[in-house]
Regions:
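N-terminal, positively charged regions that mediate nucleic acid binding
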Residues: 1-59
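Internal helix-turn-beta structural module
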Residues: 11, 301-354
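A short glycine/serine-rich beta->alpha loop
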Residues: 11-16, 119-131, 216-220, 275-281, ...
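Glycine-rich anion/phosphate-binding loop at the beta-strand->alpha-helix junction
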Residues: 15, 21, 200-203, 207-316
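Alpha-helical support elements that line or immediately flank enzyme active sites
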Residues: 21-33, 129-151, 224, 228, ...
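Glycine-rich, N-terminal phosphate-binding loop and its surrounding beta-alpha-beta segment
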Residues: 44-104, 108-110
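Short acidic, glycine/tyrosine-flanked loop/strand segments centered on an H-E-D-like triad
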Residues: 99-125, 307-325
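Glycine-rich, mobile lid/loop segments that gate access to catalytic sites or pores
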Residues: 114-222
Length: 354
């Protein structure tokens, strides 16, 4: 099972399962001598933590990182960093029927085929969204490193169940427990989530991310492009099913004269009048904000009866899912998107020597 990110300057590994004693991360390539603000890291992790509100899973976990190596005090020492989060609130018996009857929309069946039935199905095992907690440890640390260089990564909910945030701008929402710019839109989204839960269903949505302060010239052409790096890490978030940069797919319906971002000189630097390209051309940053959106699917674990198969009998079957699940994972995925983007940008920045 390959849960490794082999970057240009960073090496990242995520380990554990949703109901194993612990989940964790190893991260190599951090500079020695950097002091981690543990309060800030804790606040970042709490944005993703479960069991905090009505639109989250009832499973409660403290998600406190326990650092095993890589730090002396709170300062990086140059050794690989390793941190774990202990799982303390599991109910593995809720998942016993999934060994034979896989969940539609989840990785149960593909994991069964890949690993011959030896996979851990409890809580989704290694395919669970729970594994984004250690991703956020790595991302939270890289976020502090980027902040020192004047680079900020900020994401928000762009839409849930087809209900869009009314603002096109990314105002700071990291202190909100429901990260939407418009409070009115937030209430409509919460209502849609509540309706889905009452109907034993779930909803998905869109997340918008913006990265400011990235200098022009970062990234490589073709396989080493910034879009490639961000996408690779973003798809480590289990619910992500699509990504677009700038106008993305909407650009396909425009003419070149409409899509092209006109250049001009402003305060001694080259800028663009629009940002349809999302701040990246040819895989390389152009100095404008990097903007992308992610599509997040509805949570596949829903309470209503679903059609599936019995793998032991090789016949059609019905599935009733037990356990504790999010009716919408989008709000908790927002910091995960920030984490993925932050790791990608810091890796490219460190490798470039900028």
């Amino acid at each position: 099972m390959s849960s490794f990110y082999h970057g240009d300057a960073l090496e990242l590994s995520i380990f554990g399962q949703s109901h194993s004693p612990a989940i964790g991360v190893t991260l190599s390539g951090l500079p020695a001598g950097f002091s981690i603000d543990m309060d800030e890291l804790g606040a970042f992790l709490r944005r993703r933590a479960p069991g905090q509100n009505a639109w989250s899973t009832p499973r409660k976990e403290a998600d406190l990182p326990d650092f095993l190596s890589g730090l002396v005090g709170n300062v990086t020492c140059g050794a690989p960093l390793c941190a774990v989060i202990h799982n303390t609130n599991t109910r593995s018996q809720d998942y016993n029927n999934l060994i034979d009857i896989p969940r539609p929309g989840h990785a149960d069946y593909t994991a069964q085929v890949k690993f011959g039935g030896f996979q851990d199905v409890a809580g989704g095992g290694h395919f669970s969204g729970r594994l984004t907690a250690p991703l956020c440890i790595a991302g939270g640390i890289c976020k502090q490193l980027l902040h020192e260089k004047g680079i900020e990564v900020m994401a928000r909910i762009d839409a849930i169940a087809g209900i869009e945030d009314t603002s096109e701008f990314l105002a700071p929402v990291d202190r909100k427990n429901f990260p939407v710019t418009s409070d009115e839109s937030a209430e409509h989204m919460k209502a849609a989530i509540a309706r889905a839960r009452a109907e034993e269903d779930s909803v998905g949505g869109l997340i918008r991310c913006q990265i400011t302060g990235v200098p022009a010239g970062l990234g490589e052409p073709m396989f080493g492009g910034l879009e490639n790096k961000i996408s690779q890490l973003a798809f480590a978030i289990p619910a992500v099913k699509g990504i677009e940069f700038g106008l993305g797919f909407a650009a396909a319906g425009l003419r070149g004269s409409e899509n092209n971002d006109a250049y001009r000189v402003e305060d001694g630097r080259v800028v663009t009048e629009t940002n349809h390209c999302g701040g990246i051309l040819g895989g390389i940053s152009n100095g404008m904000p990097i903007v992308f959106r992610l599509a997040v699917k509805p949570t596949p674990s829903i309470a209503r009866t679903q059609k599936s198969v019995s793998l032991s009998a090789m016949q059609n079957a019905e599935l009733n899912i037990h356990g504790r699940h999010d009716p919408c994972i989008v709000p908790r995925a927002v910091p995960c998107v920030e984490a993925a983007a932050t790791i990608a940008i810091y890796d490219a920045l460190k490798a470039s020597g900028i």
